[in-house]
């Protein structure tokens, strides 16, 4: 008799416990990456070129220029994570502009997350919370 009572009580707890669901609420709203940004730092160093990145949220495309060549590709985002796909690029050689172009494309290959605060975009490394690039959103 004791076994039947204990089994019944255990069964009641299991039924009640399995019937409840938990909600996960995100503390921060999802920010859609969109617009044109002027790059101001790469790996913590100020740059003097007019490098720009443009994110199109409708078709998830990225476009950019660091003073000479255009590059383009696709991106996906989920909350604060960011993954940039394979980039295509024009192949002109421009004296002085190539250093920033290579640096920006390397950053875009290694980005894992982003943050937008007060119109400033920061791209972070995929392996650590290290800022790789900062940019200011252009007025539209």
What are these regions (language model features)?
Residues 1-29:
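Bacterial Sec-dependent N-terminal signal peptides
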